[in-house]
From Swiss-Prot:
Effect on the protein upon substituting residue 112 to A: Reduced auxin (e.g. IAA) efflux carrier activity
Function: Acts as a component of the auxin efflux carrier; this activity is enhanced when activated by PID-mediated phosphorylation. Seems to be involved in the lateral auxin transport system. Together with PIN4 and PIN7, involved in the connective auxin transport (CAT) that ensures communication across the shoot system, and modulates strigolactone-mediated shoot branching control. Binds auxins including indole-3-acetic acid (IAA). Coordinated polar localization of PIN3 is directly regulated by the vesicle trafficking process.
Subunit structure: Homodimer.
Polar residues bias locations: 314-348, 449-460
Outcome, altering residue 51 to A: Reduced auxin (e.g. IAA) efflux carrier activity
Stated name of the protein: Auxin efflux carrier component 3
Activity regulation statement: Auxin efflux carrier activity is competitively inhibited by naptalamate (N-1-naphthylphthalamic acid, NPA).
Record organism: Arabidopsis thaliana (Mouse-ear cress)
Basic and acidic residues bias locations: 430-442
Signals that turn on the gene: Down-regulated by endoplasmic reticulum stress treatment.
Lineage: Eukaryota, Viridiplantae, Streptophyta, Embryophyta, Tracheophyta
PANTHER family in the cross-refs: AUXIN EFFLUX CARRIER COMPONENT 1B-RELATED, AUXIN EFFLUX CARRIER COMPONENT 3
Highest taxon of the lineage: Eukaryota
GO BP: any one term: auxin polar transport
Disruption phenotype: Plants display defects in hypocotyl differential growth. The triple mutant pin3 pin4 pin7 is able to suppress partially the highly branched phenotype of strigolactone deficient mutants lacking MAX2 and MAX4. The abcb19 pin3 pin4 pin7 quadruple mutant exhibits an additive phenotype on strigolactone-mediated bud outgrowth responses and shoot branching control.
Length: 640
């Protein structure tokens, strides 16, 4: 039986952690002590110094020659069971998907062992359980986080290949990734160059696009055409990126009388549409500058029959209807251009689908720098056709739903990954629903070749061809090499990688030959690692305070995530531990460890790669709040 003294011991060890977290939360939300920039500095200190040195301290002082192999085997078996079930689910069921498999694996098997687990388990089951937790931390940092990174990079590589080489991927025999490309997470514009070798196979080079190196210099600067080609990752809907560029401050600084003159953003200058011609977005130019003669779409009539307004290049359902009205005013133009209609499937939807009507210009005649352009950018009016060139224009029509779920990538504008909003309905992004989307909707736009008519096709029109395209991938050895290159480049930039490996190497040397660390080095590490635990919880509190809401993904999804975290994980761990033969306190430690709150590193990866970040955010924040009573319930029940 668990005595009141045992409960008090546990609370004594855990409540101070929550005090640090609550102080950080109040410092931002209630007392306004820290600004977001200051919070960012604190979090960076914790990520680079405090947590790596804390993990180094625990790992270097733990005897690797006294590791409990059966306990490690049980933990490993739990993760293998979950991974195997998720692989089967993703490949052999209609509702399975790679994104959900990664998310469920993170929720069920990767708890916050370092910060929360070590002090909690030591208070519950003694010092030996703390040593077991350190062993779990070593495996997490060296093996399981690397595996998770491998899965994310596999997803990124698969998206890149499906977008750039939908028909010829099987002919790729090598990838060369330039040194400045760190990841395939979609943060940077990437372009691919394919060369045909003597053997008739493709040799692909992946590099950063010049557009990602440019900066938006000023409002009077005429945007120059970028050298973006069809072989480029545009990250339109798969990994939407929000910008911290403050347009209001920028325009005030440059002397504009009003606020932002239009919603033309720096990213738009180098988007898929703007690299092929001037495609202005709906502007509030006339509202701010009281220019009643300025048309709504930034379109300056030239009286020619070839003039037509440019629709919003973003896939936004809020501006689609307006764009259609403007396009329908010139029916002749609609008939003179090739058009492709994308059905969304025969199944009716609860939300009305809206028709997206847009034009795509060829990169051969980019009139942005050659012509006077739009008056918004300081150019003179063009008498020919109002600053627009319709040469090489291709017309695209597609039906898009008016709402999408967070974490699911459709051809609709999503909020930035840092917003964590809009996830109010629970649905797997599975194959059944994907059949109603445009082809490769989870990857954004298909490759738009300069000489093509942007032939976007729907999955419903492919039928059996979809399965054959999935098999149309490079050889496994080529894919593996590409992914390993990207994973290696990510790992060597992560301070936790060095702290874990150096700590393990030092422990192997120190406990083998009984070598003591020099006092100066030991005290230098100790003074920072001692603060690491409190600073990690403080940083978590800052993170909670900076979020718009604690439950960012909707109640139904949050309930599902908490069930996976606190029920599925411990249940699978119990099965694995019993199968390995753990009994007594070892079994209890294994189960309670599996019921710890969600780890922070999986959330960081989910945010970087934009794979259900709202769910992992809720798992970290809300999971931390309810973790103490849940672990106490497990502790009491297992002690009966």
């Amino acid at each position: 039986m668990i005595s009141w003294h045992d409960l008090y011991t546990v609370l004594t060890a855990v409540i101070p952690l929550y005090v640090a977290m609550i102080l950080a939360y109040g410092s931002v939300r209630w007392w306004k002590i820290f600004s977001p920039d200051q919070c960012s500095g604190i979090n960076r200190f914790v990520a680079i110094f405090a947590v790596p040195l804390l993990s180094f301290h625990f790992i270097s002082t733990n005897n690797p020659y006294a590791m409990n192999l059966r306990f490690i085997a049980a933990d490993t078996l739990q993760k293998i069971i979950m991974l195997s079930l998720l692989v089967l689910w993703a490949n052999f069921t209609r509702s399975g998907s790679l994104e959900w498999s990664i998310t469920i694996f993170s929720l069920s098997t990767l708890p916050n062992t370092l910060v929360m687990g070590i002090p909690l388990l030591i208070a519950m089951y003694g010092e030996y359980s703390g040593s077991l937790m350190v062993q779990i931390v070593v495996l997490q940092c060296i093996i399981w986080y690397t595996l998770l990174l491998f899965l994310f990079e596999f997803r990124g590589a698969k998206m890149l290949i499906m977008e750039q080489f939908p028909e010829t991927a099987a002919s790729i025999v090598s990838f060369k990734v330039e040194s400045d490309v760190v990841s395939l997470d979609g943060h940077d514009f990437l372009e691919t160059d394919a060369e045909i070798g003597d053997d008739g196979k493709l040799h692909v080079t992946v590099r950063k696009s010049n557009a990602s190196r440019r900066s938006f210099c000023g409002p009077n600067m005429t945007p120059r055409p970028s050298n973006l080609t069809g072989a480029e990752i545009y990250s339109l809907s798969t990994t939407p990126r929000g910008s911290n560029f403050n347009h209001s401050d920028f325009y005030n600084m440059m002397g504009f009388p009003g606020g932002r003159l239009s919603n033309f953003g720096p990213a738009d200058m180098y988007s898929v549409q703007s690299s092929r011609g001037p495609t202005p977005r709906p502007s509030n130019f006339e509202e701010n500058c009281a220019m009643a003669s300025s048309p709504r779409f930034g379109y300056y009539p030239g009286g020619g029959a070839g003039s037509y307004p440019a629709p919003n290049p973003e896939f936004s359902s809020t501006t689609t209807s307006t764009a259609n009205k403007s396009v329908n005013k010139n029916p002749k133009d609609v008939n003179t251009n090739q058009q492709t209609t994308l059905p969304t499937g025969g199944k009716s939807n609860s939300h009305d689908a809206k028709e997206l009507h847009m034009f795509v210009w060829s990169s051969n005649g980019s009139p942005v720098s050659d012509r006077a352009g739009l008056n918004v950018f300081g150019g003179a009016p063009d008498n020919d056709q109002g600053g627009r060139s319709d040469q090489g224009a291709k017309e695209i029509r597609m039906l898009v739903p008016d709402q999408s779920h967070n974490g699911e990538t459709k051809a609709v504008a999503h909020p930035a990954s840092g917003d964590f909003g809009g996830e109010q309905q629970f649905s797997f992004a599975g194959k059944e629903e994907e059949a109603e989307r445009p082809k490769d909707a989870e990857n954004g736009l298909n490759k738009l070749a300069p000489n093509s008519t942007a032939a976007l096709q729907s999955k419903t029109g492919l039928g059996g061809a979809e399965a054959s395209q999935r098999k149309n991938m490079p050889p496994a050895s080529v894919m593996t090499r590409l992914i390993l290159i990207m994973v290696w480049r990510k790992l060597i930039r992560n301070p936790n990688t060095y702290s874990s490996l150096i700590g393990l190497i030092w422990a192997l040397v120190a406990f083998r030959w009984h070598v003591a660390m020099p006092k100066i080095i030991q005290q230098s590490i100790s003074i920072l690692s001692d603060a690491g635990l409190g600073m990690a919880m403080f940083s978590l509190g800052l993170f909670m305070a900076l979020q718009p809401k604690l439950i960012a993904c909707g109640n139904s999804v949050a309930t599902f995530a908490m069930a996976v975290r606190f029920l599925t994980g411990p249940a699978v761990m119990a099965v694995a531990a019993i199968a390995i033969g753990l009994r007594g306190d070892l079994l209890r430690v294994a189960i309670v460890q599996a019921a710890l709150p969600q780890g922070i590193v999986p959330f960081v990866f989910a945010k970087e790669y934009n794979v259900h970040p709202a769910i992992l955010s809720t798992g970290v924040i809300f999971g931390m709040l309810i973790a103490l009573p849940i672990t106490l319930v497990y502790y009491i029940l297992l002690g009966l």
